[in-house]
Structure formats: structure tokens, C-alpha cells
Amino acid sequence: MNDYMRATLAGLLILSSLFTSQAAEFSQIRPDEETLSELPTTNWLTNGGDLFNRNFSALTEINTGNVNQLGPVWRIHLDGSGIGAKYSGEAQPIVYEGVMYIITGADDVFALSIETGKVLWRYSANLSDEISTVCCGWTSRGVGFGEDKIFVGQLDGILKALDKDSGAEVWSIQAEAWEEGYTITSAPLYFQGMVITGFSGAEFAARGRVKAYSAEDGSLLWTFYTVPGPDEFGHDTWPADNDAWQTGGGTVWHTPAVDPELGMIYFSTGNPGPDYNGSERAGDNLFTASIVALDAYTGDYRWHFQEVHHDIWDYDAPNPVVLFDLDYNGVPRKGLAQAGKTGWLYILDRTNGEPLVGIEERPVPQEPRQATSATQPYPSGEAFVTQTLDVAPEGYRLINNGAIFTPFWEEPVMLRRGDANWPPSTVDQGKGVMYVCAGERQAAYSVRENLQQARPGDRYTGGGMRFASIPITGILSAMDLRSNRKLWSQRWPNRCYSGLVATAGDLLFAGRNDGRITALDARDGSKLWEFMTDAGVNAPATIFEHNGKQYVTVFSAGNLLGRAKRGDSVWLFTLLDEEEDAIALAQANLEGQGLFQNTCQFCHGRNGEGGHDGMPLEGLAAFDSSYVADIIRSGQNNMPAFASMFSASQIRALAEHVRTLNPDIPNRNSR
């Protein structure tokens, strides 16, 4: 072999080595941006379903014509993890290749077999009971997935990666310290070899931030502070004579969205700190209560839109941003929408942050002691909730009709507080519709004067917000993304606090605080199916296909702020034929038990022993199910008819349950 041939061979070997190395590097980036950008089908790979946060499934096997045949395949308990007064179950399950990954309010992670519901592995976080910088209950909204790892953000500020097959720890870092006010409640986002997360803590003198880490080893790649420091763009919206920016809030509650084509990442931010006293933080207080766009690879600022200037009402923006592509006046546009605590949708061009549907600055009432902003942004169209009060609650007088943006000082001022909180919205891009899950409340605001400089980790609200003793109601609204007007809207008897998932089968799935999972017709909001689980359904559903069949799964674990019964169950549903329906009767008893506990026990007692105005339920096994179901359906003696309240399948489930109560005591009517 001559020197030329040796040199040529050496060069080829070097090139081959480089190509092999690059191929190995790129093969590690999975799922890739193309997969994560597609509407989910066989898997559900990220919180929100895709990088656009659409919470939309392209599957159609389950649709408006057959959803009434939906039934439980299995239910699994998660070893009692996250059951307790301080916990909430808000996590959306992730699904990959026949395995489901779910995290509880205790930050314990479970891998479940789709086929059987069997627990394949469990990771226990063993959180310290000393964690005290938690705003709104111990919770997690999900895990991230990528490169054969499950990414977990914990309340103690730890971010870690677990092996997807075994649950073994791959790496762990102390991303932030809970003692300084920082916790992680959102699902981490995997994108192009990065794990990206925000941090909660605006009520604890925190300075908001988003960080990106290497998915391979957890090393820090970039940081963006949502409250700018000296010499950074936006710092001039904070006072020059103090260090209010250091404890300025603006934390990020939710999983961001990404547009890979533009190379931008998007999120919205929390309230400034302190929440209710603006006297020490004059200025607009960027980038709090804002939508922010960054370069996804570097974390560099690209644009922002502030929804509330100098927020003193806790009108921040915890609802996840959603991306969509839609024609406006015949021109294709890249859109972004966010449902604010103000009760408005903010619909923007995600390339530059300019409104796609008009937003104008309007003068608002002033309170000099609060250093209030002279104007606030008012989107055109309609709000998805009411923004004023028509009657003053007992013990209060109305100022400015209780309208949003009414300022306050020491004397409590009652205002409308209709909002979209963390429960995610969903977008049907084909229809050009965004569905929003919200609540309507009213609260009296007041400040606490003589603020002392807070240290990170101190409770730092600067006042208070007291809710009126009036029931909180839920609002579910379908909003036209082109006009920002309501297509339909409905009021629920309690707060909408689960998040939403829509499908190409014209369905909208929503959980309820009383334990129901419901399927609505997305076109008009009519209820088509519901199932009573054993605890509050306060997490968005996940929809996927496995072995050619469509499934719906939901975490039924309850919620602190939703005042929902706690639990530890994951439920899996699919379309059942008659034979499978018979097999599911055991699960129907679980549904019947839930219905009984939420409706019947108040009169008949928890175990059917009798109670207020209700006779004992004894020995009903002596009668067949159809007889008992007829009584429930039509009513008897002082018991009202439930035909209009419960579906036929629910009545059957309830009948099956009450027949199991006190079976050894003869029924007086069976003698």
C-alpha cells in the first residue's frame, strides 16, 4: 500500500468516525422535533400532547356517535401516593410504546402497563415534610420524556432524569432551592436534547426564571430571568431607587410551547411580588403577567406582550400558551393564544408578538398609593367570563361595579375574579376554536402597609384577597380564534378545574370536581357521556391509540383548591361491546360507589345505614338490578327521581352498588 492509499484510507476512517459520532449524537435526540410537532396518535409524548400545547388528538374512532359506549378497561391504585389534605392530582399521563408514566402530588412516579394496568416500576421522591414555600398545595402537572428518560421536576427544586424502563436515576441536580422560594410544579419539556423548565414561587419573594439543561447529563445550558436585572432590557420598568426586581416574582407555572420552524419557545408569567402592594415597585414590572418569546436554543429575548401592567390583583397568566396556524382574512398566520386571569383571550402573531385580533390600551381607575398604571390592554371581542358584579355580596359595597382593574388600598374592595388558572385550554385548529376551562369568583382585595424588605423564601404578598361566601361557579367556553367571540358557553355548579382535551371526533373531554369524567359535543357543549370515578378528576385526560384501538386515560386524585375528594387512581377507558361491558360490571360497582358517595350518602348514610330523611338500604340483593334501577330512575316515597340527573349506565352502576349494601339484613319488603 503506497503513501497515497494510506492517506486516503486514513481520511476515510476519520470521516467515517465523524459521521458515526454525529449519527450517534443525532440518534440520541428522540423524539425529534418533527415527531413532537405532530398531533399525537399512538403516543402522547409531552404535556399538552405536542410542542404547540394544543391538547388535541387527531383520533376519530371514539366520536360523538359512539362515545356512549365508552367504558372502563382497568383502574389501578398508586399505593396511596399523594392522598392527603395538602396534595392535588393534576398530572396529565404521558404514553410511550405501551407504557404510561404518571406522577402524583407527592412527586412519586409510576410506570404502568397499558395492557394490564400493572405497575412496572415506581420511583419515590421522599419529599421532606419541611418544604414550606408552596403556594397552592403539593402537586405536579406531569413528567417529561426524551432520549429514553423520564424527566421529573420536584417541589424541593430538584430536577432529575429516570431510566424509562427501570425508573433508575440517571442524573439529578439541585436546580433551585425551595428554601429560597423556588419549587417545580410544571412538567419539564424535552426539545432537541434540552430539558426546559420554569419555577414556581412568586408568593415567596422569588425572581422568575426559565432554565434549559442538557438531557444527557443535566448540565445547565441557558437561563432567562423574567424580571430583568441592571443593564438588561426591561429593567427600566422597575424602580431605580430600590432592589424590588430581586424579589419581583414573574414565575413560570406551566410547560412552555415551541415552534421548531421559528426556533422560538413561548411561555406566560406569574404575578409581580409582592402580589397586592404596588407601592414599592412603580412601573410596568416587566416581564410579569406577560407572554414571552425566546430563542429556544440560547434563551435570548425575542419579544413580549404584557397582559397586565403593574399587576396588583394577581391577574397573572398561569394558563399554558397554545400555538396554532390559521388563516386571517385569507392570509396564513402563525398564531398564539393565552387565556388570562383577566377573563380575556390574548391572540397574537407568534413571529413578533403583535395582536392578530385587536387589543387597545384604555384608561383605568387610579390609586396613586398603588402606583397604578394609567392604562391596561383591552382585547376586542368578548371575555370568556363576566368581569363585573351586579350585586354586592353581604357585608361589602360595590365600587366601579366590582370591575376588573379597580384599584384598592387598606379598605377591602370587592371585585370580580373570573379567570383561567393552570388547567390547560385546548385548540381545534381545523375549527379555529379554543376551549377554555375557567371559574367565576369574587374577592375583596386590600393591602398591608409598611412592607419590610423580603428575603427569597419569605412569604411576600403585601396584602390579602378574601373570597366572598358565594359559591364559585365554573365556566366552559368555546372561543372563535378569528373574532375572539364566544361560540358557546356554559356555567357549571362548581369550578372548572381539570383542563380540557379535544379530539377530531368532535369530542371535548373534561374532568369534574365531584369525580366525573365527561365527554361533550365540541360543537355545542352538549353532554354525551360521563363516568363517575372514585375521586375528583382534576387533571386533563390523555388520548392515544394502542394496538389499533383508541383509549382515554385520566388521573383521578382530587384537588386542594377544587375542594375535591382525594384519591390515587388511574382509569383507562375504551369502546366496549356487550360482552366486554359485562366484564366491566365489576368496574361499574366502582362507578356506583362513587355516585353513591357523592349523591346518596347524605340521605342514606355512608354505608346505607340510613340518615337525614333517608331510609336504611338493607337486603336489596333480594331484588334484581332492573327493579332497583327503576326505583332510582323514577323515585319512591320521599326520594326524588334521578332519571334526568344520571345516565342509564350510571343508574345501572348505582343499582349494582346499593344491592351490595347490608346484604345480611333482610329487606322488609322481601318477606
Residue ranges and their predicted role:
Residues 76-92, 122-144, 172-187, 204, ...:
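Extracytoplasmic beta-rich repeat domains
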Residues 29-31, 578-595, 668-671:
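Electrostatic cytochrome c docking/interface patches
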Residues 579, 588, 632, 644-671:
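C-terminal capping alpha-helices of c-type cytochrome domains
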Residues 183-216, 310-372, 384, 404, ...:
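Repeat-solenoid scaffold signature
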Residues 209-219, 284-298, 474-480, 568-576:
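Beta-propeller blade signature
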Residues 44-48, 86-108, 133-158, 183-204, ...:
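Repeat-blade elements of multi-bladed beta-propeller folds
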Residues 29-73, 226-233, 393-404, 465-466, ...:
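Blade/loop signatures of beta-propeller domains
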Residues 593, 602-638, 642-645:
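Gly/Gly-Pro-rich "capping" loops immediately C-terminal to redox-active cysteine motifs
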